[in-house]
From Swiss-Prot:
Active site per UniProt: 192 (thioimide intermediate), 199 (proton donor)
Protein name: NADPH-dependent 7-cyano-7-deazaguanine reductase
Source organism superkingdom: Bacteria
Record NCBIfam families: QueF (TIGR03138)
Gene name of the record: queF
List of residues binding substrate: 91-93, 231-232
């Protein structure tokens, strides 16, 4: 049994290519990109776009991108895309994959030309300036595996008998001890809002405030296991629930989802402005 949010029948979602038989085009086609309004889940969370309680970014890693140079020779590249937290739309991932595939048989004079096109198209889809960085020198580009820092919640030996999302697990979340600490878990699993395909993630929670009850926090994270929502929406829900139930001075929630279709999505939400985000590839990515 899956758990869907109230907005899952919104007409915007019914027009997405997700869950439908689609044509894989190999000629450049920016119309393949599809947007999902961030307001869908934010309205349910009672968030105002004019006064959001967080900052952050959706960091995408591209592993499958290719085009033809002016002589018709294929070029391959990896890339990093950063979508601002306050863009009007998030970018639907299957449409992003189909869009990238449309570059396969299209000619571009340079990597800079491709980067310019990607930046323009993704910014248009998100309705906010998006940054794009591409790499073609794959033999001289470092992309080492890393690990989260802090204390792992997964060592807790707890019994679980319910897998339906339940924020009430966070009742009385904070003690009276003031701390600054980082906690993480590899047990976050949610499901695609449209197809119910499993989405796997590791999540890092860094905060300053009254100490959080680790067992309650882990039980809450596991309760996403049958919940249907997009990656970005899950992270915002987790951020808001921790802020609601905990006595928190500052908070950063950073999830790194496993790769699908040559893309991984890594949403980060934080109480503070950020200039840089650690694009740390984990083992399952």
């Amino acid at each position: 049994m899956t758990n869907k949010p109230l907005y899952d029948q919104d007409s915007t979602l019914k027009n997405l290519s997700l869950g439908k038989i689609t044509e894989y085009k190999s000629s450049y086609d920016p119309t393949l990109l599809q947007a999902v309004p961030r307001s869908l889940n934010r309205n349910e969370l009672q968030l105002s776009e004019h006064n959001l309680p967080f900052y952050g970014v959706d960091l995408w890693n591209i592993y499958e991108l290719s085009w033809l140079n002016s002589k018709g020779k294929p070029v391959v590249a990896t890339g990093v895309v950063k979508v601002p937290f306050d863009s009007k739309n998030l970018i639907e991932s299957k449409s992003f994959k189909l869009y990238l595939n449309s570059f396969n048989q299209s000619k571009f004079v340079s990597i800079e030309a491709v980067q310019k096109v990607l930046t323009a198209d993704l910014s248009h889809c998100a309705d906010k300036a998006v940054s794009v960085e591409l790499h073609t020198d794959l033999d001289n580009f470092s992309d080492k595996l890393g690990t989260f820092s802090g204390q792992c919640l997964d060592v807790l030996d707890i019994e679980i008998d319910n897998y339906q999302l339940n924020a009430d697990y966070l009742q009385d979340l904070s003690s009276q001890e003031q701390v600054t600490e980082t906690l993480y878990s590899h047990l976050l699993k949610s499901n695609c809002l449209i197809t119910s395909q499993p989405d796997w993630a590791s999540i890092e929670i860094s905060y300053t405030g009254k100490k959080l009850d680790r067992e309650k926090l882990l039980r809450y994270l596991i309760s996403f296991r049958q919940h249907n929502e997009f990656h970005e929406q899950c992270v915002e829900r987790i951020y808001c629930d921790i802020m609601k139930f905990g006595q928190i001075d500052s908070l950063c929630v950073y999830a790194r989802y496993t790769r699908r279709g040559g893309l991984d999505i890594n949403p980060l939400r934080t109480t503070e402005h950020i200039n840089e985000i650690n694009n740390l590839r984990l083992l399952r990515q």
